[in-house]
Amino acid sequence: MKAKEINWTDVDFVTTSASYYTVVAEQPNGVMNGLYCLNSLVFPYYDTANTKEKIWWDQFKSDYDYDPNTGAIYGYIFADIVVEAIKRTGEDLTVNNFVKAMETLKDYEDPLKLSSVSFDPGIRHGSNISYFFQVQNERFEVISGPINY
């Protein structure tokens, strides 16, 4: 982080969920250590993953020849949500019917059980929890949460 280069070390940096990406935390020499951010799911690092998460990780690595990152997990989870809504829409797939089907998702858990989402006509953000993370040793570590909002 540029702030460390200019010795601006007495300031804590808190970012949005957009920075919750493994490539951010994994910058060499711990340059991102100390960064804080919020996000609605906890990335399953392989060494701390449960059996289901490891099976998914191994399959991803077998298919793509590299370890999954947060983008991979988001893609997997978001695709699962969309596929479930399409199934619930039925044969008459229109935008309006798809939206109505999305609104039937209540406490819907993704296959890895990392997060659950709910939608209705007044709730469009899906999740209502966040975890507070700090980059430590080039990985995101939960320091608080889940926090309801």
Which sequence ranges carry the predicted segments?
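Electropositive phosphate-/nucleotide-binding environments in soluble metabolic enzymes
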Residues: 50, 54, 76, 80, ...
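Segments of small-molecule ligand-sensing domains
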Residues: 62-72, 83-139
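Extracellular/periplasmic periplasmic-binding protein-like sensory domains
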Residues: 1-75, 136, 140-148
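Alpha-helical scaffold segments in soluble metabolic enzymes
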Residues: 2, 81-84
